[in-house]
Each structure stands twice: as structure tokens, then as C-alpha cells.
């Protein structure tokens, strides 16, 4: 299936969650028992599905991201994209990899110095709290980085809710049990 404006348009095979721009139901799935609202408001918008991609090594992930981000820039040249990571070391790894791939309009964000210009900004999830981007890519969402703990669930919630249009999730190795459970729940019929 090919969708305009998403990473599927370049041939990635993905696992799709039931909804894209996170609606209260999807937010509840991500938060689990930590949901703060007893009755979340109804969502008034829908969007492309959440896309989850698993890789065997970081190099393959970076190469695929570079290809997908180049395609996205051609289709939506004014889009703002945040590549959000669990920590500074992962941010540096992905930033260097995308620099080597010669991705245009790429910026490394430190100390919340976001430009909000079209292009790709790489930073840690914690730095993006309270901000929104057209596309958000949560990278390295593996079991080691995000174990099934309340702090991990909260951090993933912060990252996932930054996306206005679409959320992409990548993982090298074993997917976080939190995300695996959320995807499983979102794919069940009501």
C-alpha cells in the first residue's frame, strides 16, 4: 500500500497501528494505567496510522530514515520533523549518521534551541516536551531503552504526543514491551 506523505511511499514494510495523529484512545493505550483523565475528550481529527519499523542494526535504520526523510522533503518541503531519541548518545549517533547520509536541512538541537523551520531536528524526547512537529520519529524504542516501567511509559507518551500529522517509531532489536502492547491493543477490533 502506498500513501502520499508517509514512509510507505518509499517501499518500507511497516506494522500499522489503528490510528495516526494520537487520539485519546491511542493516548490511553500508550499511557495504560498512568492515564490521568478518566474520560478523555473525543478526538476531532484523524490521520495516517502510526508506523513502527524494526531493524537489525543502527546503520540500516539510519539509511532507511535518510531515504524516507528525503522522500518526505520532496513531497512536503515545508514539513517540520523531529527525530526524538531516549538520550544524548543516541541523538549524536543518529545525527552523525544522517549527516553522513547528506540529509539536507538537518539540525542537532541542544538546550531546546529549536528553529521550527522546515527540515529535520534531532534531539532527546525530554527536550521536545510541550512542542509540536508535523512528523515525529521516535528512534531506538527498544526494550533496553524503554523497559516496562512508569518512567519509560511517561517518556514515550511525551514523544508520541509531539506529532501533529504522523508518528513513526523505529527500533533496533527487540521492541519495547510498552510499544509492543500498545500496537497489539490498537490492532484488536473493538
Question: What function would you assign to each model-found segment?
Answer:
Residues 20-46:
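Short, compositionally biased "basic patch" segments
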Residues 39-67:
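Glycine-rich phosphate-binding "P-loop"
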Residues 8-9, 35, 50:
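Polar low-complexity intrinsically disordered regions enriched in Ser/Thr and small residues
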Residues 3-25, 44, 59-63, 70-168, ...:
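Core RecA-like ATPase module of SF1/SF2 helicases and allied nucleic-acid translocases
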Amino acid at each position: 500500500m502506498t500513501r502520499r506523505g508517509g514512509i510507505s511511499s518509499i517501499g518500507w514494510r511497516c506494522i500499522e497501528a489503528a490510528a495516526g495523529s494520537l487520539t485519546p484512545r491511542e493516548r490511553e493505550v500508550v499511557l495504560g494505567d498512568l492515564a490521568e483523565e478518566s474520560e478523555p475528550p473525543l478526538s476531532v481529527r484523524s490521520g495516517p496510522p502510526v508506523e513502527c519499523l524494526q531493524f537489525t542494526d543502527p546503520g540500516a535504520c539510519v539509511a532507511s530514515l535518510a531515504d524516507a526523510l528525503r522522500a518526505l522533503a520532496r513531497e512536503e518541503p515545508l514539513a517540520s520533523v523531529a527525530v526524538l531519541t531516549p538520550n544524548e548518545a543516541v541523538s549524536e549517533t543518529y545525527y552523525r549518521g544522517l549527516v553522513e547520509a547528506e540529509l539536507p536541512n538537518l539540525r542537532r538541537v541542544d538546550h531546546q534551541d529549536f528553529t521550527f523551520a522546515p527540515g529535520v531536528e534531532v534531539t532527546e524526547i525530554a527536550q521536545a516536551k510541550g512542542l509540536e512537529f508535523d512528523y515525529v520519529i521516535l528512534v531506538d524504542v527498544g526494550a533496553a531503552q524503554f523497559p516496562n516501567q512508569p518512567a519509560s511509559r511517561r517518556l514515550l507518551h511525551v514523544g508520541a504526543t509531539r506529532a501533529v500529522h504522523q508518528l513513526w517509531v523505529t527500533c533496533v532489536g527487540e521492541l519495547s514491551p510498552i510499544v509492543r502492547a500498545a500496537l497489539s491493543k490498537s490492532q484488536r477490533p473493538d
